[in-house]
Amino acid sequence: MVDSGTEARARGKAEAGLQDGISGPATARVNGKTQAEAVAEAELKTESVTQAKAGDGAMTRTHTVTYREAMAVTREVIKVEDTTKTRVMVETKTKPLAERSIVPQTKSKAMPMSRVSTVTKSEVKVVAVIEANIRSYAKSHDKANTGSRPDRREETSIGMKSSDEDEENICSWFWTGEEPSVGSWFWPEEETSLQVYKPLPKIQEKPKPTHKPTLTIKQKVIAWSRARYIVLVPVEGGEQSLPPEGNWTLVETLIETPLGIRPLTKIPPYHGPYYQTLAEIKKQIRQREKYGPNPKACHCKSRGFSLEPKEFDKLVALLKLTKDPFIHEIATMIMGISPAYPFTQDIIHDVGITVMIENLVNNPNVKEHPGALSMVDDSSESSEEPKSGESYIHQVCKGIISCPLNSPVQLAGLKLLGHLSIKFEDHYVITSYIPDFLTLLNKGSVKTKFYVLKVFSCLSKNHANTRELISAKVLSSLVAPFNKNESKANILNIIEIFENINFQFKTKAKLFTKEKFTKSELISIFQEAKQFGQKLQDLAEHSDPEVRDKVIRLILKL
């Protein structure tokens, strides 16, 4: 047993560690064989602690510090034998509690934290009941003094900045961790508590979004340009993979468009290659004709192919007679399977769908008629004395060809010929010198090309000259300088020439007949037209806004 003198000495040592002390007697009376009662009382004491911080830039802060000294009187009841030893250990920790009245405080040093520990031979630990009793007493005492709360909050919020080290020391006296352990003793949870220290939240860096490259028009054109021939071939009846209906299928099953590669046929329920019968293609053509836009409503768009049932059957019969890839490629354009590049669709329309296929199948090597639609009738050519205008134009054209390349005399002659070509009546004379002008266009300087293109621009306005300008040689020479490195004036002239050619096709004029073309010529024209379409897409990203606008307008017209 420990008497009251030992307990007083232990409490005295603890009080010496405090600056202003935590005072209060703690009396423990223990009777050996009788009942002992421990009565705990808590007294609230409020002290104002003002400390000064030495050094430059002293910072001040207002804090309310409340010390509650717990006076513990331990009462134990022991109903065991006299020989049993009792050990009582009472550990009292001073805990800072917020006070009603506000007293300014200047901090300089860390305020000491005192503990009063009374250790006896008993192993009884301090349970949470003592702390709960102190809290309940404090809450009941707060309800009686609610009137002073607003002033306390308003004054307490006034504070100055302190250093990080002092802030951490002060915070460690009032709470542990992130949640305050003081405020909940003095006010309900729904009320706003005093400002407490909370560590700054960690900023989580958001992952950078992955850049998805957008396909430019040029990249789409590259994917579009990888064309291949789709040949319609008969399938032998003995094969097990033959579709249930029809005996004609497509060997190639994928087509490439600006939007990517898409499957053309359906996957059959049986093993074998993919098939699309001509009956299905015919059905698709009927649907496009029924639900598609009216081709006569807008002349700026390319006309769609419309096949009558008789024409479709005739086309299929003609395809059975040949396996020529070029003829089958034209058939896929007509059926809407393959894309038709600029002017190719117009040429097919102009000649006639079945007429072109029939002529290519029956007479693949027919020679082009020596005459041209741009020439006048034989009466004008057989006249004994040519007109004065014709002779003069002949003289000018011969002078241009005979002059040195890019010479001032040649440039002057080309400029004069551009003015003479305004009249359509003399165009048949100029068109006879087109091969010589193409040489100047391919080898001449920028100025020479400019004046030659001016002459071609005037010729393209005449419906009778379109047949000569659409030839493979002319298209090849016009497409060659059609790039970003060419001068702006020359690019605009080439665009104007193709706009005029496109306009002549859209007027439904009969520019081609089955006697006026050969298979080799059509192949060359289609190849040059395809190359022109690709370069046209490249120029859609030209740096000059005027060129870019003209190119986009031409694309929409085609």
Curated annotation (Swiss-Prot):
Bias (Basic and acidic residues): 1-14, 139-156
Positions of region (Disordered): 1-35, 139-165, 369-388
Keyword Ligase: no
Keyword line: Repeat
UniProt cross-references to Pfam families, sorted A to Z: Arm_2
Keyword Cytoplasm applies: no
InterPro entries, alphabetized: ARM-like, ARM-rpt_dom, ARM-type_fold
Extent of the ARM repeats: 300-339, 422-461, 463-503, 520-558
Family recorded in the similarity comment: Belongs to the eutherian X-chromosome-specific Armcx family.
Family matches, as PANTHER family: ARMADILLO REPEAT-CONTAINING X-LINKED PROTEIN 5, PTHR47081
Identification of the protein by name: Armadillo repeat-containing X-linked protein 5
Organism: Homo sapiens
